[in-house]
C-alpha cells in the first residue's frame, strides 16, 4: 500500500510517499518539503496571500519529484491524502483542489486528513507506537494535551487559553529583535544565557486542569526587556534562557496533571509523546524525557525533520484511515478551523 501525502496548510509546501513494509511498519519512500521562511522573514510572520501564491508555484513539481524519488507513479499509488485543515484557508484550498483533481483523474481514493491528527499519528510511523498514548501537540498555532486512543479517537485533556507555545516563542523573538522563525532563535540564544537571572512567572502551575496560559509570561519578559533597554547581547541571551526555562517548567507541570487525568479516559498510556514544531526544542524534549522516566513511561518524539509540517505525516495519517475504510468523497470541504479532539469532561 502506497499513499501520496500533500501538505499546504501554512508556510511549508510538502509532498511525500509512504508505504507499509513487510513488518507492517511505516516506511517513508520520499518526503519533499519546500519552506517559505525566506518569503516571510521580512514580515516577521506568515503572510497568507504570499503563502498561498508560493504553494501554487511549486506544488505540482514537488508532487512529481516525490513520486520520482519514491520510484513510483501516480498509477501505482493506492490513495491520495491531503491536509484539508485546519490552517490558512488559501493554502488548504490549493492542496485540497490539487488532491481532488489527482484522485478524480487517476481514480484513486481521496483521504482528507486533519493536519493535527497527522501530527498525533506520526509516532506510529516513526516508532510503531501502540495506542493509547499521551500527546503534547505543540506548534505555532496549537498547544494541546491529548489522549490518543485510536485513529479518529482523541480526548483533549488540556489546551492553551491564549498563546500557543510556538506563538509565544515567535513573539518573544520578535520583541527581542531576533530572526524568524523565532523558536529556533530563542533556543539558540538560550544556550549561552543564564536561565536564573530573571524570575519570570510560571502561569497555571499547580492548577487541577491541564490547560496552559503563556500571555502573562510573555508580558513579564517584555517588562524586563523594557527595563533594561538598550539590551546588551548577554541580556538577550539571559532573557531567552529565562523564558525557555519557564516554559519548560510549565510544560512539565501541565503534562504531570494530564497524566493523572489520562487514566480516567484511556487507561494506562504506552508512552508520553511530543509532536509538532515545538517538539524540536531540545530543552523541552529533555525535560519531557525525564518526566516520562520518572513515571516509568517511554518518551517518543519524531526525528527533527518530522516535527514540523511535512507530507509524510499526511500520507501516514491517510494510510491509517484507508486501512480502516475511511475514504472521503470529492465534496469534502477545506476547513480553516477543524478541532480533532473532544474536550474531556470536567473532573
Swiss-Prot record:
> What InterPro entries is this protein classified in?
ATPase_NBD, Gcp-like_dom, KAE1/TsaD, TsaD
Q: Where does Fe cation bind?
A: 115, 119, 309
Q: Keywords of this protein's UniProt record, alphabetized?
A: Acyltransferase, Cytoplasm, Iron, Metal-binding, Transferase, tRNA processing
Q: What is this protein called?
A: tRNA N6-adenosine threonylcarbamoyltransferase
Cofactor: binding details: Binds 1 Fe(2+) ion per subunit.
**Job of this protein:** Required for the formation of a threonylcarbamoyl group on adenosine at position 37 (t(6)A37) in tRNAs that read codons beginning with adenine. Is involved in the transfer of the threonylcarbamoyl moiety of threonylcarbamoyl-AMP (TC-AMP) to the N6 group of A37, together with TsaE and TsaB. TsaD likely plays a direct catalytic role in this reaction.
| Any single Gene Ontology cellular-component annotation | cytoplasm
> What species is given as this protein's source?
Methylorubrum extorquens (strain PA1)
- Stated family: Belongs to the KAE1 / TsaD family.
The record's listing under NCBIfam families reads:
gcp_kae1, T6A_TsaD_YgjD
- Which GO biological process annotations does it have? tRNA threonylcarbamoyladenosine modification
- Cofactor(s) for this UniProt protein: Fe(2+)
What is the gene name?
A: tsaD
Give the location in the cell: Cytoplasm
Primary location recorded for the protein, binned into one broad class? cytoplasm
HAMAP family attached to this UniProt entry: TsaD (MF_01445)
Q: Which reaction does it catalyse?
A: L-threonylcarbamoyladenylate + adenosine(37) in tRNA = N(6)-L-threonylcarbamoyladenosine(37) in tRNA + AMP + H(+)
Which residues are noted in the entry as substrate-binding? 137-141, 170, 183, 281
The uppermost taxa in this organism's lineage are:
Bacteria, Pseudomonadati, Pseudomonadota, Alphaproteobacteria, Hyphomicrobiales
Q: Which residues form a coiled coil?
A: none
Keyword Calcium present in the record's keywords: the answer is no
Amino acid at each position: 500500500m502506497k499513499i501520496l501525502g500533500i501538505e499546504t496548510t501554512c508556510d511549508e509546501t510538502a509532498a511525500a510517499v509512504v508505504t507499509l513494509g513487510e513488518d507492517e511498519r511505516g516506511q517513508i519512500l520520499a518526503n519533499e518539503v519546500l519552506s517559505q521562511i525566506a518569503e516571510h522573514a521580512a514580515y516577521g510572520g506568515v503572510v497568507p496571500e504570499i503563502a498561498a501564491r508560493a504553494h501554487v508555484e511549486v506544488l505540482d513539481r514537488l508532487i512529481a519529484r516525490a513520486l520520482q524519488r519514491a520510484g513510483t507513479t501516480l498509477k501505482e499509488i493506492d490513495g491520495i491524502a491531503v491536509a484539508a485543515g485546519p490552517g490558512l484557508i488559501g493554502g488548504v484550498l490549493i492542496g485540497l483542489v490539487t488532491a481532488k483533481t489527482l484522485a478524480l483523474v487517476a481514480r484513486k481514493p481521496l483521504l482528507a486528513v486533519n493536519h493535527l491528527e497527522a501530527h498525533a499519528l506520526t509516532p506510529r510511523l516513526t516508532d510503531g507506537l501502540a495506542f493509547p498514548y499521551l500527546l503534547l501537540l505543540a506548534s505555532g498555532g496549537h498547544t494541546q494535551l491529548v489522549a490518543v486512543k485510536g485513529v479518529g479517537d482523541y480526548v483533549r485533556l488540556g489546551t492553551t487559553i491564549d498563546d500557543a507555545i510556538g506563538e509565544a516563542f515567535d513573539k518573544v523573538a520578535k520583541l527581542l529583535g531576533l530572526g524568524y522563525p523565532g523558536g529556533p532563535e530563542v533556543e539558540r540564544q538560550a544556550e549561552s544565557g543564564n536561565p536564573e537571572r530573571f524570575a519570570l512567572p510560571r502561569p497555571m502551575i499547580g492548577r487541577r486542569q491541564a490547560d496552559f496560559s503563556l500571555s502573562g509570561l510573555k508580558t513579564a519578559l517584555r517588562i524586563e526587556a523594557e527595563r533594561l533597554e538598550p539590551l546588551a547581547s548577554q541580556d538577550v541571551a539571559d532573557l531567552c534562557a529565562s523564558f525557555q526555562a519557564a516554559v519548560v517548567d510549565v510544560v512539565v507541570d501541565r503534562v504531570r496533571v494530564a497524566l493523572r487525568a489520562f487514566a480516567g479516559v484511556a487507561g494506562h498510556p504506552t508512552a508520553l509523546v511530543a509532536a509538532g514544531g515545538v517538539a524540536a526544542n531540545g530543552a523541552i524534549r529533555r525535560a519531557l524525557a525525564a518526566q516520562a522516566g520518572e513515571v516509568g513511561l517511554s518518551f517518543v518524539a519524531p526525528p527533527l525533520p518530522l516535527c514540523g509540517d511535512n507530507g509524510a505525516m499526511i500520507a501516514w495519517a491517510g494510510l491509517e484511515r484507508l486501512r480502516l475504510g475511511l475514504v472521503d468523497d470529492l465534496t469534502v470541504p477545506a476547513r480553516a478551523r477543524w478541532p480533532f479532539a473532544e474536550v474531556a469532561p470536567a473532573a
